[in-house]
Each structure stands twice: as structure tokens, then as C-alpha cells.
């Protein structure tokens, strides 16, 4: 089994998380190599087609104006991608490794906490992978037969049918139950899927680490839209979800 072989070869005994925790997350988050064209996708949830009001009149200027968006059905991962999942892809695709990934595709900080091409930071295998450029994230998705979600897809999945600021019923006092942020993270990245999921079954949609989406950044339009993908060109790509 590739997971077991990589674990024995690349992680010293004291670095590996408990077998129970690893197996639980493997089942929950779908630590797999290729979803292909299966009808059921381990570690993913199906988001039904729908229409929602995207943005927030109470948020930052970049979140305005609120506008109506329609989105087709799509699948999205339940969990943020871990160092361990990323390692599996690096083992098969040297192009994405720290020493070989072209400099033009990142800012110089790519996988800066990894000790080597196939050695993540100590005790980080079940934590979300960080210091990943948009291009690296897109290549990773392509290698395993997936793609980056659009910003609209991310938001409808995060909202879970809600219309308020958070993806759950209740105010900011409930936020520590759903995510890691400045006040409760201890200034550290945490193992994925340790908090309560949203109604769609997605974990860490609030905090822990930022998540890349497909779109170039642009100001929102008042116009209604269907399956928006953002502008064709831009200066910055969009991240969603927040971090600590």
C-alpha cells in the first residue's frame, strides 16, 4: 500500500501520528491518488445546483455589491489538503517537488517548511499543506483528476444555505467550535477536520489556513451571473476562508 510504504520510508517512528487518527482521517478526507470518473468520490461532498446572493454589504469593499449567482452541481473536498496528501502526489510527480518546481510558478517560499523534497516538517503530515502557490495548487488538482473551485463555488459550499456572516446558526461566540483563528489557534496550524463541519460536511471552512480558488481577483458586479469564473486576466488570484 503506497501510504504504508511512504510512511515507513519517509517518517521516523516518532514523527508519525497515531494509527487510529491516521485511519480516521484517511476515511474522512479520502487520502486517495486519483478520483478518475467514479460516481462516488471519497473525501468529497456533492454540492447541489443552486442560486444564492454572493458577497456581503456589511463586509469589506471587496465583498460588495451583493449579487445573485447561479452555480451548477459540483464536488468539493471535505478537508483542506494535508502535507501527507501532497506528499503522495510529489512521490509520483517530481515536477511539483521543492527542488524542481519552476521558480516562475512561485514566490520563492514554496514548501519552505519542508526539510527536503519528500520530507515535510516534523509532525505536520496531517496538517494542511502551506506555502503553496496558486500554480502549485492547480497542478496538484490536475494530477489527481480534480480542479480548483471557482470563488462562487467555494462560497455556496461554505454558506451551506445560510445567508449570514458564518456558515452556522449563531454568532461569533460559536466560532471556536467551527474553526481555528487568532484567539484559539495558539499561533499554529492545526490537524485538519478537528472542528465541527458546516452543514455541507466541509471542515475548516472558517480559519486554519487560506484556500486558493480559481478566479483572478476583480471587483464584483451588480449583474446576475451563472457559473462565474472571474476575469480572463488579472494581477492577483483569490484566496478564501481565512487563517489564524
Give the ranges of each region predicted by the language model.
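Mature N-terminal segment immediately following signal peptide/propeptide cleavage
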Residues: 43-53
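Pro/Ala/Gly-rich low-complexity, hydrophilic intrinsically disordered segments
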Residues: 2-39
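Short, polar loop/linker segments at the starts of domains and inter-domain junctions
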Residues: 54-73, 189-195
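Structural recognition of the beta-strand scaffold that forms the well-ordered cores
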Residues: 46, 130-131, 147-149, 165, ...
